[in-house]
UniProtKB/Swiss-Prot annotation:
Pfam families: CRF. This is Diuretic hormone 1. It is found in: Secreted. Stimulates fluid secretion by the Malpighian tubules. Increases cyclic AMP production. It comes from Tenebrio molitor (Yellow mealworm beetle).
């Protein structure tokens, strides 16, 4: 149905955005830990 083709890209974008945010947070945490050493 047409609804799927509309909602699917939104779900993909949301997943991508959340993964990107999580990755940036991990990098930030790693840099913070490195700055403590």
């Amino acid at each position: 149905s047409p609804t799927i083709s509309i909602t699917a890209p939104i779900d993909v974008l949301r997943k991508t955005w959340e993964q990107e945010r999580a990755r940036k947070q991990m990098v930030k945490n790693r840099e913070f830990l490195n700055s403590l050493n």
